[in-house]
Every structure is written in structure tokens, then in C-alpha cells.
Amino acid sequence: MILTIDIGNTNIVMGCFHKDQLLLLERFSTEQDSTSLEYATIIREMLDLHEITPAQIRGGIISSVVPSVTNTVREAAEKFTGARMLVVGPGIKTGIKLAVDDPAQQGSDLIVGAVAGVHSYPVPQIIIDMGTATTVSVINRDKAYIGKMILPGVAVSLNALSGKAAQLPYISLEKPKKLIGSNTVDSMKSGILYGNAGAMDGLIDRINEELGEECTVVATGGLAGVITPLCRHEIILDEDLLLKGLLILYYKNCGNEKE
């Protein structure tokens, strides 16, 4: 089995694959002050929950946008499983051409998503990742990563609104019954949810116009399932996209034997 770990700014998503089958999918908070022992305890609990033993893990791969946590989680996973953990970074084979000004500045999560996107869906392609930040990546018909847009994530926007406006409460993100809100809470929900959906539709239109052709659109990330149903464009929701990309990169760099 292969352990896949995606370290984000807010959450860490962990998966475990047997061949191409995802057997485990768990999410826990990213804590920059946690020790390798504390993370090892979490990993152990997650594997125990799914009745997976350390001996069954023959390797793993980690993608991270939080450098201060990367080595801590890697040490935790290696210490508990005894298997080597590959970290996505410079020198790793991706099979993706990075047609951008500085390839070294591209986040590993974006590269992992692009690898999975190209492997699974037609190009040209737009990949929307809705996490702490929302990123909109573009892959052209030659399967080259040509750039991206970055905007505040849904939760970040909501927290900023509630935190800076004294009379606006903190709210949960359920779809309101109608677009035009008749009370403060529904008005905020409508603005955040439909506003983000409208932003995605607008960016998709502009990207298609700039490329001169229609793109396949794929969405992933913690809040993609909330926003994409409100978009007018057809968007493929793939919540496991990054874990699939990590598995592809593991096989590409560590051999193709699938166990």
C-alpha cells in the first residue's frame, strides 16, 4: 500500500492506496507546533481506524505548502511505517512542462493537481482548487502548465467579512433558499457562495476567450463541493484529485509495481 499525504495551510489530507483503489481518506488540522510524535500518533490512529498495519505500507509521498510542517510529518510517517516518504519538490519527475516565469515558485499542490488532471481528463484544462486560497490553474492543449490565478479562499473571505464588520456574524456555509437575501445571515451566505460561483464562471469565460477554445474544468478542495453546484459552467468535481496525483508521482519516481 502507498501512503499519500497532502499538507495544506488549514488541513492535512491523508490517503492510502492499494493499487489504484483509495482505501483510506482522512482529514486533520495542520498544526505548525505539533511534534513528529504527535503527528505519528494521528497517523497511527487513522490507519488503525481502517485496520491497516504499518507493515502494509511499502512507501509514501508527501506534498506540502507549509515548509515548517513538511519534515515533521515526513519523520512521523517514516518513523511509524518504516517506509521511505518521497517529498514533492525540485528534481522530482512530473511529466508536466512548466511554461511559467519561475517553475521553482510553483506550489507543489498545483503541480500534483496538474499531474492528476492531465492523466484523467481532456486538455486544455482548468483546475480549480478551493482551499485556504482558491487557485485556478490552466493547462494548454500541449499539456503544459501555463499559469494560474490566485484569490482568497471562500472561508478566508467569510472570516474577513465577519471579523472586520462589527455587525456581521460568523455563519455556516449552507446554500440559502433564494439568491436575494431577506436577512443578514442569508444575505451573507448568498454573497459568499454565489459571489464565488460567479467569480469562477467569469474566470472560466475569460480563460476560454484568451486560449481561443473551451477547456475541461475540474474542481477540487474542501469547499469545491459547495461552490461548483452553483456555477453555470459544467465543472467536474474530483475531491480526491491531489491524492490521485500523488499516487501517479509515486509510481513515476519509485517504480510502477502496484501493491
Briefly describe each language-model feature range.
Residues 1-25, 117, 123-145, 161, ...:
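Gly/Thr-rich phosphate-binding beta-strand-loop-beta motif of the actin/hexokinase/Hsp70
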Residues 95-125, 245-255:
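Conserved phosphate-binding catalytic cores of ATP/NTP-utilizing and phosphoryl-transfer enzymes
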Residues 52-106, 142-147, 153-154, 182-193, ...:
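Short beta-strand-loop/turn "lid" adjacent to the catalytic site in phosphate-handling enzymes
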Residues 111-112, 166, 193, 225, ...:
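Glycine-rich phosphate-binding/hydrolytic loop that grips phosphoryl groups
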Residues 139, 144, 151-210:
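Active-site rim beta-loop-alpha module in soluble metabolic enzymes
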Residues 1-87, 92:
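N-terminal glycine/serine-rich phosphate-binding loop of ATP-dependent small-molecule kinases
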